[in-house]
Amino acid sequence: MLEFETNIDGLASIKVIGVGGGGNNAVNRMIENEVQGVEYIAVNTDAQALNLSKAEVKMQIGAKLTRGLGAGANPEVGKKAAEESKEQIEEALKGADMVFVTAGMGGGTGTGAAPVIAQIAKDLGALTVGVVTRPFTFEGRKRQLQAAGGISAMKEAVDTLIVIPNDRILEIVDKNTPMLEAFREADNVLRQGVQGISDLIATPGLINLDFADVKTIMSNKGSALMGIGIATGENRAAEAAKKAISSPLLEAAIDGAQGVLMNITGGTNLSLYEVQEAADIVASASDQDVNMIFGSVINENLKDEIVVTVIATGFIEQEKDVTKPQRPSLNQSIKTHNQSVPKREPKREEPQQQNTVSRHTSQPADDTLDIPTFLRNRNKRG
């Protein structure tokens, strides 16, 4: 029998801090989508832009330095503005168990201030996750270079950094999509990155995760990637899972990850079988020693849609810095259970959660191959 914790006081405090224009827009998208269980903070050097934020806490940083006129696309100004307002930022983030720092990289405030804010959050003891976008190529070389510097600084400051490559968003949207709509979609993907994680902890669902589970997957894990899959119809769970692990947003195959966090969100008709089916597809595509946790959330607004979000953490830097390997086709990346997968070095940490989908080197009996991995494990325990 499943047991549910009802200790309300034990809920993790999650704060989302949007930094600069892109971060503020992502926070607005989250509020519009009624993302539950998180506190929102909007931070900007531009007082006028800050007034457009829907966040309950709005914080103008670097008032003396910028006089509320913005950072002029200069990351150094953004950095100094955050340093000027350090005490104000500390006060806003105090008491948080988990802090998401979300920003668009390449401009002044997001690029310069976000790493400073992330470091403050981490110093306060919060699990700190950065969710940032890399600018579109058409935004110019200067923004690309500034973004690279900002991303590098963010990696040093956070536990896990999810980088969303805006150019890959163009592979998702239609070719005739107006430029404003493309930027809006980039903000929306930022929102999905945060919501995909926060919902698992803060929103009641079929399968919820402990904050400790998420912490294990995301503490001090460095680079991370995100894939999103959406599907409807008869085979919607399998389709959404396949789309998530072959998402253009994933710049590397998920079998290179040390940890995988998965969110399966559907309407009130989402079945437990569909959750099992989606989770098993993602588990099969992952390294056999991966530490994987998953959860499921009910969103009444989705009706027939299923959304699968996969956050893959702990990529080894050398693998990504070398000439980028081509993302494998779906058929290559989904490994069947009876294929042996070579173990990767360095050795992974042993999974610690109950929800972890553990991969065994011993092969299951043929007649159990159709049963999802974690169901087989549960049957063995039973």
From Swiss-Prot:
Activity regulation annotation text:
During sporulation, is negatively regulated by MciZ, which binds to FtsZ and inhibits its polymerization and the formation of the Z ring.
Q: Which GO annotations describe the biological process of this protein?
A: cell division; division septum assembly; FtsZ-dependent cytokinesis; protein polymerization
Q: Which SUPFAM superfamilies match?
A: Tubulin C-terminal domain-like, Tubulin nucleotide-binding domain-like
Q: Where in the cell is it found?
A: Cytoplasm
Superkingdom classification of source: Bacteria
Cell division among the record's keywords? yes
Q: Biased composition, Basic and acidic residues: where in the chain? A: 342-351
- Where does this protein have compositionally biased stretches of type Polar residues? 326-341, 352-365
**Signal peptide span:** none
Q: What is this protein called?
A: Cell division protein FtsZ
Q: Which UniProt keywords apply?
A: Cell cycle, Cell division, Cytoplasm, GTP-binding, Nucleotide-binding, Septation
Question: How does the annotation summarize its subunit structure?
Answer: Homodimer. Polymerizes to form a dynamic ring structure in a strictly GTP-dependent manner. Interacts directly with several other division proteins. Interacts with FtsA. Interacts with Phi29 DNA replication protein 1. Interacts with the cell division inhibitor MciZ.
Recorded GO cellular component terms are: cell division site; cell septum; cytoplasm
Q: What job does this protein perform?
A: Essential cell division protein that forms a contractile ring structure (Z ring) at the future cell division site. The regulation of the ring assembly controls the timing and the location of cell division. One of the functions of the FtsZ ring is to recruit other cell division proteins to the septum to produce a new cell wall between the dividing cells. Binds GTP and shows GTPase activity.
Q: What does the entry list as the binding residues for GTP?
A: 21-25, 108-110, 139, 143, 187
